[in-house]
Amino acid sequence: MFAEGYIGIAGTIGVGKSTLTQDLAAALNFEAILEEVDGNPYLESFYKDMKGFGTMMQVWLLNHRFRQHREFVTRISLGKIRGVVQDRTIWEDTIFARMLNRHPEKLISDLDYNTYLDLFDNMVLRELVFPQILIYLDCRPETAMERIGLRGRVMEQTITLDYLKMLKENYEEFIAEMEGAGVRILRLSWESFIPIPEVVRLIHEYSLKPSSFTKWVRPLRKPPKMNPKTAEEAKAYAKV
């Protein structure tokens, strides 16, 4: 099921999702839904003991994003807001949980990972709706790396170019599966920023495309192609 007035922004770390989310929401008179990091009670403990807190870190993120998703969909349906533009949808959470599971140190055990996926499925099957349009911002990993450096977030300093390359591969797989299920995907090359009026025009154009939604899709259940080599890299993987 789709929610009219719900636009998702997807893409790797550093591509520019937050900036587009805010600018696009302002242009459409929608509400911007940004990622929240400061309120995570597991964050500090996770960085001290990733294996001990990896599972609960992901469960907290899933629960937080689920509550956020349910609230804004309800507000749209009741006419309290025109719509939302969301920086990283709940559908992408499974990408990062899976990376922790496939880490050489098994930062999330197979048992915990499967329990997490069951929890995700139960939430999705009962409550969640797909965005009207999912905008995928596509850029080279090298470009994303440069942008990460420019914004200077301390917790992102352990991110490597190899990680960004593999993350991009996982995102490409995610987008292909979502598109195969009939979700409208607006793929934008984000090597350079596109003017907001042009993005708005493309959104209106894609909104007229018929939906071919045929089945429920559970993104990214296949084994990942990347095994982070160090615990330091894993800090970056679970962060965003």
What are these regions (language model features)?
Residues 9:
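Hydrophobic anchor at the beta1->P-loop junction of P-loop NTPases
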Residues 20, 24:
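Hydrophobic positions on the alpha1 helix immediately C-terminal to the Walker A/P-loop
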Residues 17:
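Conserved lysine of the Walker
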Residues 26-64:
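Conserved substrate/cofactor phosphate-moiety recognition/catalytic segment
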